[in-house]
Swiss-Prot record:
A GO CC term attached to the entry: cytoplasm
InterPro entries cross-referenced by the UniProt entry: AttH-like_dom_sf (IPR023374), Ceramide-binding_SVF1 (IPR051385), Svf1-like_C (IPR033394), Svf1-like_N (IPR013931)
Membrane topology: Peripheral membrane protein
Lineage: Eukaryota, Fungi, Dikarya, Ascomycota, Pezizomycotina
Name listed for the protein in its UniProt record: Ceramide-binding protein svf1
Source organism of this protein record: Emericella nidulans (strain FGSC A4 / ATCC 38163 / CBS 112.46 / NRRL 194 / M139) (Aspergillus nidulans)
Length: 380
């Protein structure tokens, strides 16, 4: 019956047994003293399109000089090698707090395909292309006539993945992992272009970041909690992605993050933390909604200087609380819906009372106000 149980849990998302922390190989194990991270090449950025259960996402966050905050995302998912779907999401946040709903579009994509090098993606009325030099993505979408997207993200600092390949592996046999979680980042981008809605043309000239993720397993098997921050100041970009595994993998915390400036990664590594310093119980979701978070980065530059950085302070009123089960496409929901005890909610923030990045590199100290987008996700 065990094979049936594990197959069922892979496809239907039932709970996993307790394997313990030995059954996870965090990405930090790939780091060496002289190679804590890898600078990304064009080849690293290719879509994988694996033929087993996995979800691949390319997510672009834009913070326009005029204050507009946007997330655009392509999701490519394969369920048990039998069903492939692609989805395009675009969210224009209302940061004014006046109660006007965010502009949110989520559309299935049809006839999707990749170019020969697997670095560009297309489907009916949408294309995402990586240029020849591998330093700019252009996204054009007319999938939904209510939201016409024409954006270019130019890499302003090198991209990075932690260790050799940015991947945490799951499984009791490290040589044959049964699951994985990978992240790659362009922490600092210059954004140009527009998003046209029925109401107006949004000029998106400004700053941004790009995150590529690949979950080679059921999302709720890999993580029970997530914390994410994208913090952009005139001179620096600070990003962090942290997840905590369910008890089946020892409630292990995996944290990847980095700090960049134009042309340079100052630090990238795993010795970072995200601490919810204040929270209150959210009645709708029954999760402890964070009110204040302290983000800390600690490590060394390439040439051995000590780096410490923090962003700390009140998050202000949340932008949004997303009931994931209400949002996900139907097919994925039926597969995820049988999860015992999973109640996935995402809380999103962008403090309008701006917070500051405090950064110390060697003996030099910097403090700069910045634009922030962050998420706290609770799953189980």
């Amino acid at each position: 019956m065990n094979w049936l149980k594990s197959t069922l849990s892979a496809v239907a998302g039932t709970q996993e047994p307790i394997y313990g922390p030995e059954a996870i190989q965090p990405v930090s194990q790939q780091q060496t003293e002289d190679a804590p991270y890898t600078e990304l090449t064009k080849h690293d950025l290719r879509w994988r399109a694996y033929q087993y259960t996995n979800v691949e996402t390319q997510t672009y966050y834009a913070m326009a000089d005029n204050g507009t905050l946007v997330m655009v995302q392509i999701i490519y998912s394969n369920i048990a090698g039998i069903h492939t779907t692609a989805q395009f999401n675009c969210k224009i946040f209302n940061t004014s707090g006046d109660g006007t709903p965010h502009i949110w579009f989520s559309d299935p994509l049809y006839n999707h395909m990749f170019d020969e090098s697997m670095s560009s993606f297309a489907a009916d009325n949408i294309s995402l292309s990586l240029n020849e030099e591998g330093n700019a993505y252009t996204l054009k979408s007319a999938v939904n006539e209510g939201c016409l997207v024409d954006l270019t993200f130019n890499r302003a600092a090198p991209g990075f993945a932690i260790g050799k390949d940015g991947t945490t592996y799951f499984g009791t046999d490290p040589q044959n992992p049964w699951g994985s979680m990978r992240h790659m980042f362009w922490p600092r981008c210059n954004v140009t272009g527009t998003i046209t809605t029925k109401e107006k043309v949004h000029d998106m000239t400004g700053r941004g970041m790009f995150s590529q993720a690949l979950q080679g397993m059921k999302p709720h098997h890999a993580a029970s909690r997530w914390n994410f921050i994208n913090f952009q100041t005139p001179s620096f970009s600070a990003i962090m992605m942290e997840f905590t595994t369910p008890p089946s993998y020892g409630s292990t915390v995996v944290n990847v993050g980095g700090i960049a400036k134009d042309g340079e990664i100052i630090y990238a590594g795993t010795t970072n933390s995200a601490t919810h310093t204040e929270a209150s119980q959210d009645e709708t979701s029954d999760w402890p909604e964070p009110k204040s978070i302290k983000w800390v980065w600690e490590g060394k530059t390439k040439d051995g200087k000590t780096v410490t950085a923090e962003v700390d302070g009140p998050l202000g009123p949340k932008l949004d609380r997303i009931d994931v089960m209400a949002e996900v496409p139907g097919f994925i929901k039926t597969i995820a819906g049988s999860v015992a005890g999973a109640r996935p909610y995402i809380f999103q923030y962008s403090p309008q009372q701006k917070l500051s990045l405090k950064l110390k590199v060697g003996d030099e100290e910097f403090t700069e106000e910045g634009s922030m987008f962050s998420e706290a996700t609770f799953i189980s």
